[in-house]
Amino acid sequence: MYYTYIIYSESYDIYYVGQTNNLEDRVNRHNGNRNKYTKGKGPWILVFSQKLDSRSEAVKLERKLKSFKNQYTLKAWINKNRGLEHPV
């Protein structure tokens, strides 16, 4: 199983989109400052995740979410899809 996920930093008011096969470990890595982009910008809160059958499906959704022009579009998508897998 793979996951596409969105985490949020309240202190910086930013979202990060990613995909992984181990969701809990990946979020812990973001909060442990072991990721270049998210380092020092936490704490990070998981606001959305969706379980997918393959990595290619997870990457496809990740790319779609990263293609949104701004965080407001991403936030609207999260609100529309809330409850799909992981509630905000």
What are these regions (language model features)?
Residues 1-36, 40-52, 56-66, 71-88:
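GIY-YIG nuclease catalytic motif and its immediate N-terminal context
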